[in-house]
Amino acid sequence: IVGGMEATPHSWPHQVA
């Protein structure tokens, strides 16, 4: 997960890896 908020699953718009 590369989004910065890997601790929050619902914070990923497209980063569901």
Swiss-Prot record:
GO cellular component: extracellular region
GO BP: any one term: collagen catabolic process
Boundaries of every Peptidase S1 domain copy: 1-17
UniProt catalytic activity: Hydrolysis of proteins, with broad specificity for peptide bonds. Native collagen is cleaved about 75% of the length of the molecule from the N-terminus. Low activity on small molecule substrates of both trypsin and chymotrypsin
Role of this protein: Serine protease with chymotryptic, collagenolytic and SANA activities.
Family designation: Belongs to the peptidase S1 family.
Protein's recorded name: Collagenolytic protease
Source organism (scientific name): Carcinus maenas
